[in-house]
Amino acid sequence: MTDKPVRYHVVHETRYDYGSPVSLSQQQLHLSPRVLAWQQIEEQRVDIDPVPSWRRDGQDPFGNPVTWIAFHSPHEHLILRSAMSIAVTPHLPKNIALSPPWESVRDLLAYDSTAPRSEDLDAMRFLFESSHVRIKHELADYAVDCFPPKRPILLGAQALMAKIFKEFTFDPEATTVSTPILEVLEKKRGVCQDFAHLMIGCLRALGLSARYVSGYLLTRPPPGKPRLIGADASHAWVSVYAPDCENDWVDFDPTNNLLPNTEHITVAVGRDFSDISPLRGIILGGGGTEPEVAVTVTPLDEEEIPAGLLTPVEAGSGKAKVDLPKAQAKPAESAEKSAAKLGERVLDEAESEEIAPEEMESDEAALDNIESDKKTDQKSAAAVVQAAAGVPAA
């Protein structure tokens, strides 16, 4: 197997056309990929139209790149366009059978563990319940046959991944972004987000650390057909803590029953989806709207970048650089179970949540920048935003 990196150009574009003007908005974006030992960012930018009243880039508590933005004046649309060139080096674990027994990892992460390493303490953040992942006996019961005594932890995780792949059906209509994992377990249907949450819940129920990974998966068009701009989708998978291995965290994709390698591009990691939603925040106004989402993953060593993806969004134009479909196109057959609907569902949740980033500019400062003839209405708006800002982010 060659160690040559595989290079990609990825464009993820989202558009909102609001039913009525949005007078105030604060948002948190997870659209920039994180640098990993096997993943290097050659070029990356996030363009936003209209231009935000303020913008700040930084890191979230999990080390992911994050962008905070706010709008203090009325606007009728929002376009977000993340474009990146990225190189992914082969990084499959050499021998998962040599990973430590799963019980030893469980004991290492236990409350009374002695002298934990800093890596172990960090992994403990992914050991407990989170917004979308509850720890239930039913999950432990489902996973226990994959973890007989003394089985290496990565072999157990691989067996659990294969079990989910075999017993569950990919069905974008079966669940929503908020469907509990016990309901997913009962229905045996869902999408990549559901399967990732389920596998994470099973591992945590056994006392093991597991985290949620968001990113992109390369899909290939049918033979003889061109790559369709916007026909790819966001994807989600799982990372399992296996100390003393070549990489302490090893990824598993239960949707496709494989260990992610050079065809998976990582954007962010968190306890579950709510930590790393591509767009999350609050708006005042806007009415009802459906997001339009287009994702295009181009392998640079095999194809040229489509011309329509090379030019950034023009600020103030209100125009995207690609025609965004009302519904995502179906992924290519080679990844038939990839998350065709996750992009839309991600943004549906972002629209409904009333949670503001912790590091937003204060509402009082925001009001100073709003036109004086609208002060009365906007003081009321500020009160709403201030109340929402008091809700802690997951």
Walk through the language-model features, giving the residues of each.
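Flexible, active-site-adjacent loop/turn segments at secondary-structure boundaries
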Residues: Y16, S20, L29, V46, ...
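Short capping/connector residues at structural and topological boundaries
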Residues: S23, Q27, L36, V51-S53, ...
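Secondary-structure boundary elements
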Residues: I86, S104-G190, R271-F273, E303, ...
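Hydrophobic/aromatic-rich core segments of domains that either
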Residues: A162, D194-T289
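C-terminal accessory extensions/subdomains outside the catalytic/core fold
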Residues: D251-D253, N257-E354, E359, D363, ...
